[in-house]
Amino acid sequence: MIKNAFISFQEKKEENRGSVEFQVLSFTNKIRRLTSHLELHRKDFLSQRGLRKILGKRQRLLAYLSKKNRVRYKELINQLNIRELKTR
């Protein structure tokens, strides 16, 4: 599973589970799992709401990381294969 591959990548930072990168990683895993669930169960509105909440949390964390350290942000975006944030 994708989760195991990313966690093995993050094992060197195992003591730092509160870091922004680890939180974004765990949110991304939850998002991918919920997305595959919603492909099968289209009318599961509670899961859709949970997905939107997790997407918002991840978006806020990525915005914080892009402001604080742009290099770490770019590396994380490339590792997780997600798009960059839209800037206003």
Swiss-Prot record:
A Pfam family per the record: Ribosomal_S15
Could you tell me the keywords of this UniProt record? Chloroplast, Plastid, Ribonucleoprotein, Ribosomal protein
What are the recorded Gene Ontology BP terms?
translation
Molecular function (GO) terms listed?
Answer: structural constituent of ribosome
- List where in the cell it is found: Plastid, Chloroplast
Q: Where is the signal peptide?
A: none
Its GO CC terms are: chloroplast; ribonucleoprotein complex; ribosome
Asked whether the keyword DNA-binding is assigned, the reply is: no
Per its UniProt record, what CDD domains does this chain match?
Ribosomal_S15p_S13e (cd00353)
Record-linked HAMAP family: Ribosomal_uS15_B
Give the similarity note: Belongs to the universal ribosomal protein uS15 family.
Q: What is said about its interaction partners and assembly?
A: Part of the 30S ribosomal subunit.
Q: What is this protein called?
A: Small ribosomal subunit protein uS15c
Q: Which organism is it from?
A: Arabis hirsuta (Hairy rock-cress)
Gene name in the database record: rps15
